[in-house]
A protein has these predicted regions:
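Sec-dependent bacterial lipoprotein signal peptides
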Residues: 1-17
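Short coil/turn linking the two alpha-helices of tandem helical-hairpin repeats
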Residues: 155-159, 164, 205, 236-245, ...
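Conserved, well-structured interaction surfaces
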Residues: 41-48, 52-56, 78-160, 175-188, ...
Length: 564
């Protein structure tokens, strides 16, 4: 049965405005609440719809990822909507509303589950052999729905700042009269919700004895997902965009909550997966992947591969092409930056002895990718910028791509993809950032906590076989190293777009976008020359999204600064 369920008794209360409620009711609209509450599966369908509204970025902007609005990548199709983020073409009438809509959809469904379907008993199924198990899962829905509602509010606050806070099903009049509350109040709500439910929600769906669930249920929010949301939200709340007064106690709380995630994960037998690339392949959903805390799994598809396979492959679009900015961020295996004295970097053999994560993330000239064909991104090459929609940077994307995918018009295949939302490595990095900003040093642990920022970062670096962080760095030098580590470890996972905003450092990083010009010499050798391929400007109003103009009018929102 499909996921969307509508009931006429609630329809009038829920179809009110795009700023607060679900707009796209299509199925079962002749049925009422009594119809839905008769069966586990019908109430479960509402929960499924909540999870379906969790956003992922396998090319949300007609193939482009949010990273292509940053220094992470460039989308190879000129004129794509992603360019609006850096050419100033977005605004209240072109507001990039995807998450604005899906988050309110998810909040609406969450409120429906909590208000209307919180006390079902399913009497017709009491004799069913699975009744106890189904009721156990059903009683967990209230905690899943509260987690999801908090998650959707986090997605809103990190984009828009203050928004209306809607915590129950409402009439149209009530919804349209909701006040817009400050961002800090939204963060308080998220923190309180997560604190209230983290000890009540299921800890591990696969470890419940005779109540354990089949594999398909393990993608639901559990205790660690609740703790992870709370910790990430605390990090954002402590960051300059939302912490104008520089309140250091917020950094301490963020460190404490990230440490709690790490401790709980260890208790559950989790750790960093030895093979970084396995986090993003077609089998990443399997139980053996002990680093992923929560992910959004998609149906089988080859669209992401079609978007991002190199031009020159049948039916490929070229897609999100990693920048030289990103490639340069990968250190040498000796732990030195490529421009650091003693690094050993050879500009004419630029990918030799580099951090192993580079080869797992970026496809470079001369390697076989995605299959047996050698990638030719040199000037005039089969996969180069000289071909329509060929890479403008000299690189193609590897991360998240299932290289066994065939996208040809005949004989194609497809695989599921799993968009990683929370994974353990992030929380070592989050801890490091919070500890650094609280103590002012990369080498001092906050009171009552077990690690320094350097020690936390070293856990992530060890998996990549990179040396430990250097000692004796100043605050600014350590911060730069930390931001670089976060850039490479979390590349193309949806963080860069928001990290540069919450740090309020976008102008520093988003000015010159660089690529690699590769020229084949007469003797067959390659000449490598880094070059600036775009120079961009920044407007501080872009730190927050504009509210859609129609909702400013309908929902009494105050437009974000600079967008009026």
């Amino acid at each position: 049965m499909k996921a969307k369920y509508i009931f006429s008794g609630l329809l009038a209360m829920t179809l009110v405005s795009s700023c607060t409620d679900k707009m796209d009711y299509k199925e079962y609209n002749i049925y009422d609440k009594a119809y839905v509450e008769k069966m586990f599966g019908r109430v479960g369908g509402l929960m499924t719809e909540i999870y379906n509204d969790i956003d992922y970025d396998f090319g949300n902007y007609s193939g482009a990822m949010a990273g292509s609005a940053t220094d992470e990548s460039v989308y190879s199709h000129p004129g794509n909507a992603i360019e609006d983020f850096y050419n100033g073409a977005w605004g209240p009438t072109n507001a990039k509303e995807r998450v604005w809509k899906s988050a309110w959809d998810g909040i609406t469904y969450s409120n429906l589950v909590l208000d209307e379907f919180n006390d079902c008993t399913f009497p017709e199924y009491t004799e069913d052999e699975h009744y106890r198990q189904q009721m156990f899962l059903y009683k967990n829905y209230r905690y899943e729905a509260r987690w999801a509602r908090a998650f959707f509010y986090f997605e809103l606050v990190k984009r828009y700042g203050g928004v209306p806070l809607k915590t129950r099903t409402m009439t149209a009049t009530e919804a349209n009269s909701l006040p817009q509350v400050p961002a800090d109040s939204i963060f308080t709500f998220i923190d309180k919700e997560c604190a209230d439910i983290q000890d009540s929600i299921i800890v591990n769906y696969g470890d419940l004895g005779d109540m354990s669930f089949y594999k398909a249920q393990t993608g639901r929010a559990n205790k660690l997902a609740v703790m992870a949301l709370r910790a990430r939200a605390a990090l954002y709340r402590a960051s300059p965009l939302f912490n104008a007064n520089g309140d250091k106690s917020r950094w301490l709380k963020a460190a404490q909550l990230s440490n709690a995630v790490i401790a709980e994960a260890r208790q559950e037998g989790m750790g960093l997966l030895p093979d970084y690339s396995k986090l993003f392949d077609k089998d990443s959903y399997k139980d053996g992947i002990k680093e992923i805390i929560f992910a959004r799994r998609t149906a089988a598809s080859n669209a992401f591969e079609k978007y991002n396979y190199p031009i020159g492959i049948e039916n490929a679009d070229g897609g999100n092409c990693p920048t030289q900015n990103l490639v340069d961020a990968y250190e040498m295996t000796n732990g030195r930056a490529i421009d650091e004295q003693g690094s050993g970097y050879d500009p004419q053999d630029p990918y030799k002895d580099r951090d192993a994560r580079l080869a797992m993330t970026v496809a470079v000239n001369g390697e076989k990718w995605p299959d047996k064909d050698t990638l030719k991104t040199f000037e005039g090459g089969a996969n180069s910028s000289s071909v329509t929609y060929g890479t403008p940077t000299g690189y193609y994307l590897k991360k998240y791509i299932n290289k066994g995918t065939i996208i040809a018009k005949t004989g194609s295949n497809s695989f599921t993809h799993e968009w990683v939302i929370f994974r353990l490595a992030e929380f070592y990095l989050n801890y490091a950032e919070a500890a650094l900003n609280y103590t002012g040093s990369g080498y001092t642990a906050p009171e009552g906590l077990p690690m320094t920022a350097a020690q936390a970062i070293n856990v992530v670096r060890t998996r990549a076989k990179q040396p430990n962080m250097a000692t004796g760095l100043s605050f600014d030098a350590f911060k730069k190293k930390y931001e670089n580590e976060r850039f490479v470890e979390l590349a193309f996972e949806g963080h860069r777009f928001f990290d540069l905003r919450r740090w309020k450092e976008a102008p520093q990083y988003l000015k010159d976008i660089r690529g690699m010009k590769i020229t084949r010499q007469d003797d067959g050798t390659m000449k490598y020359e880094g070059q600036t391929i775009a120079t961009r400007t920044w407007d501080d109003k872009w730190y927050l999204f504009p509210f859609p103009q129609k909702d400013v009018l309908n929902c009494h929102l105050t437009q974000n600064e600079g967008w009026k």
